[in-house]
Amino acid sequence: MQQSVPDHLVSLRRDLHRHPEPAWREFYTTSRIVDELERIGVDQLYVGKAALGTEHGDLRLAVPDDDVLDEWFEQARAEGAREDVLEQTKGGYTGALAVLEKGDGPTIALRVDIDALPQRESDDPNHVPAAEGFRSEHEGAMHACGHDAHVTFGIGVLEQIKESDFSGTFKLFFQPAEEVIGGGKPMAKSGHLDDVDYLLGVHVGLDHPTGEVVAGIDGFLAVNHFNVEFTGLPAHAGAAPDEGHNAVQALATAIQNCYAIPRHQDGATRVNCGVVGGGTAANIIPESAFMHVEVRGRTTELMGYMKEKAVRVIESAADMYECDVEFTEIGEAPSAESDQSLVDIVNEVAGNSPLVSSTMERDTLGGSEDATFLMQEVQDNGGEAAYVCIGTSHPTGHHTATFDVEEESIDVAVDVLSKSILEIAARRP
């Protein structure tokens, strides 16, 4: 492989890595994106509410409380985020959309995600960001899934498309809040996809080494996250236990029976009660308890099957112990498949790239991603979509404290994605 990653792209990726911001708190990140878009020069630029299409309603999911948003907002301001961008993103309306208009032709879009994870980054001297001085400056947050690289991919591709003989319209979506499956839906329903003929999504790594490209990722599990609150009646645990309605017993029964839901014959189904808690003291019958639940399915219908069964189990557990129960929707994403015509083009382009050492036509994700909202929207409108993997030899898995991206993958991504977009425009499959 020949590698020559431009210095300005490495610098951008490292700046974003130093300043990770979790879902709906990407204030500094959006400001840096706008800086880059204005440097390159685009025909239309939508920021915050304008990118999310809030005139059609606020469809954001899993938005933090105002005090959390305010803390990150002020932190971004202190770190030099632009006041005009802060004004447009205040309240957690992060993200951006750039549009490049270059004459007649199809409308082609690329979607990248921009948020970080609420996770402390390793300070081990063998961890490259720590060793080379771009470890997270935000304790308890890090880019542990490569979204700093994704933003950089997008900027690099935009530069290439602008300088090319591309004919058509190119849209670049910088989507917030993927990690909580909260930002895909509002961007999909923003109206900005209505004229998109072809859409590419991209992810780095996924256990594929640097130099390997997967032309089409499939096997996205549809997912739904929801929170549950049980409310019972407190009582003295020794003197009057019969007077209490035990919310923790309802919780425990719900957990056990959620995991007992029969798996479906038509495909993979999952349930996980990932966060649980309740009670205040050992001598008080617990008045309250909570659980955070996710269900998944190989298709959106199978996810719906698991959701229906889980809700029934939880409601029944609450009834058993005379407790009230309240559900709060947090986030969701449908399943999706990559269209073969686009997979063929990306696979051919990657195979001809001097930066690519190996290709795979397809692979299965086995997880969930809210890029599927955008893919589904384009496909439902008669267009085509595909999700591409750019390999990177990360030392440990995604969502770990020592995750990192080999920066050579930036060059691979920019080359393969930009040339694929040019080829799609030329062929119009």
Report each predicted region and the residues it spans.
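A short, glycine/Asx- and small/polar-enriched loop/turn
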Residues: G92, K102-P106, A222, I284-A289, ...
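Metal-dependent amide/peptide-bond hydrolase catalytic core
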Residues: A252-P429
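Acidic/His- and Gly-rich active-site-bordering loop/insert found
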Residues: M1-M142, F166
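Divalent metal-coordination and catalytic microenvironments
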Residues: L16, L37, L110, H147, ...
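Short, small-residue-rich loop/turn micro-motifs
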Residues: V112-I114, N224-G232, A289, I390-H394
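Histidine/acidic-residue-rich, glycine-tolerant segments that coordinate divalent metal ions
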Residues: L59, L117-Q119, A131-M142, D148-T152, ...
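Sec/Tat-exported extracytoplasmic proteins
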Residues: R13, H17-P20, G41, K162, ...
